[in-house]
Amino acid sequence: MDISGILNVDKPVAWTSFQVVSLVRRLTGIRRVGHAGTLDPFATGVLLICLSQATRLSEYLMKATKVYRAEVCLGIVTDTFDVTGTPMSEADPSGVDRQQVEEALAAFVGEIEQVPPMFSALKHGG
């Protein structure tokens, strides 16, 4: 029996998107399994897993509107620009108020072009 469809998976921290796809392949026995967008290993959240015929939809799903929620630690810069890195500098963030944070976050609303950090789940050449 060939099952086609889309699974809505809550990817756990420390798992790669590829590991989730591999697990779904192993558990279902379905060969054509893919995901509609990569999440970094330390990120958790919705990972859409496409099965069989539904893999054709992944390019459209990746273009769909997405919403992100983040937890941040103000005042620390790491060598990888994320929580997995070694702290390079620290500053006291107590002088930063909610309005300043909201104003800074406003720059990330809408369509933006972001340069990915050196260490990321960016796909190169395919």
Role assignments for model-derived ranges:
Residues 1-125:
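Catalytic/RNA-binding core of pseudouridine synthases
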